[in-house]
Amino acid sequence: MPGKPYHGDVCVNECPNYGIMLSVFSWPGHSQTRHTSLTAVLGHKDGTSMVQNTMRPRQRRRGSSAAQFVRLSALALIVSWTGLLFFVWATPSRRASAEPVPLASEFPLRDAARRAREAARIAAAASAEQRQSAPSAKHDTEAQPLDAVAPLAVHQERDGFTMERDEQTGLLVPTFWEPPVGVDELAHVDAVNGEPTIFLMIASYRDWQCRDTAASALARATHPRRVVVAAVQQNRPGDVGCADPPVPCSEDPHQPLCKYSSQVRVYAMDANDATGPVYARHVGYRMYRGEAFALQVDAHCVFVNGWDVGIIDQWKRTRNEMAVLSTYLTDLEGSVSPSGDSLRKTRPIMCNSDFEGSPGYLRHGAQPERVPAIRDVPMLQPYWAAGFSFARGHFVHRVRYDCCLPMVFMGEEISIGVRAWTHGYDMYAPQASVLFHEYAQKSSRRRHVPKFWESKGARRANGQKSLRRLTSLIKMAPPDMPDDWDRTKASLYGLGTDRPVDLFYKLALVDVSRRSAVPLCQFVDSGDMHRMLHDAHLRADGRGIDYTGAARQLDVMKVIDKRLYDPISNQLRRAVERGDKNLARNALSEAQRTKLEKHHPELRELVDEARRLKGAQRS
């Protein structure tokens, strides 16, 4: 067939018992005919499944009759009232619980009313769309399949997606979810059978473990019915899909991906269109539909038993509606028992970052992993990690992944973290790990998993231009950087207004102009940051830490000096006074590791004396 196919997929839950995945491929270049492949994957609640594929020429639609318009309008009215009645009398499997999530204050659940309003809104929008676009009367009785190239009208089922054309990629993507009109977004709590729902987002590039990650989450959750898996799958023909069970559901309907198939949503992209994890996660955030909590993980993780109850309990312990639990996950090796329980008492904490390369971009380094200094609650930290992020669902809506950062890998962590802080969110290291990561460095079977930069889309992208956009949006651009960065939707993907970004850089000891950052681990890992900011300045209503008063004046460098640099400088002085070469060698090693001279240039003469004692030249 001529031309390259345009590809857009949507997974739609048509009813509580069935899930439908629509895969649409359209080839341009036909004057009167478009060829459309429509793939429907039906998953029944009993675990059975059926796949239907059709390929047929489709005549270009020229119009619809006035009679059809009248019928559609009447149908829209019937659907709206039917939706209202259904959600009023529906079984409690998808209705709001009368028992809200106990947060800083009690928030009512408005799930049933919200869904009724949403059903009426969708039907009204469909009717309005038909009225607006109705052409002159023409007899056309053939049902038309979804066309990925033609302009798209409203197309949404009760738990499905409204799709729109992405201006940057040309792909059909889900529209962003918006909170119900008149409802406080921070108070919105979605629930299933009284349990708050969890949106689990996985971005996967040709990763055969994506399905194992999803299955692990569903199998080991205490309340699996509340978990909604949203996978952005970037595959080539023959690759294992994120929703593909190891064996057909007809042979084993009890597999997690069969038993809970209606809760697994897959957005399928051609791997050739991939430009890195940022865009994939951007699409993943578009799949969010108002769930109470949002969890973002990589496609090669293993969950522990009861992870859903455990992580929500940890989040509640912060007493902070704006808490985001995030860290670099511990390696899987030696972390999970055969029965699915955690074997670890340690956890990593995000505190070590510095500028790398030229002109210098802030990157996270290796993070310390120890038994928490404060054991009964997640500990406050300055930074955010993409491989594990757990927060209330409004985080996904308010701090959206940027649409326009192709070829950026890891750099988006600084962007999301800084933007989130300016939107009022606070980062915490989890109290205990509820899942673990299989790193390629320790797993031979992962060393041959393809990387996104092999794709044609990645080769066409400009990573340096993306980094200019990323740093400019968070006011971290180098002073002499060219001003030709992409300003597409800069206000949507820029900073928040709850806190000034300059205050974040001040408290995190990040000097943007000098391209330097002080290591914060002595301040963070000791629990000082948590005690000085969380304990002292958490708002009474639990909606974030208050940085408008005394917290703004906190002298973090004084704490770092006391815990880190003062002991090193004292050790250097003792070495010089005693003429102890071994002590000088150890002190110089610490001075180099912590960049003592860079952050305290007044100590350079002392460091030089220690070097002369050691017999080494200054590097």
PLM features per residue range, with description:
Residues 51, 56-110:
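N-terminal signal-anchor transmembrane helix specifying type II single-pass membrane topology
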Residues 1-69, 100:
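Short, low-complexity, Lys/Arg-enriched N-terminal segments of secretory-pathway carbohydrate enzymes
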Residues 93-144:
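N-terminal, immediately post-signal peptide pro-regions of secreted/luminal proteins
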Residues 578-603:
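Amphipathic, non-membrane alpha-helical rod segments
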Residues 145-496, 502:
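Catalytic cores of eukaryotic secretory-pathway lumenal/extracellular enzymes that build
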Residues 480-562:
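Non-catalytic, C-terminal membrane-associated alpha-helical segments of glycosyltransferases
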Residues 569-577:
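Amphipathic alpha-helical repeat scaffolds
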Residues 600-615:
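TPR/TPR-like alpha-solenoid helical repeat scaffolds
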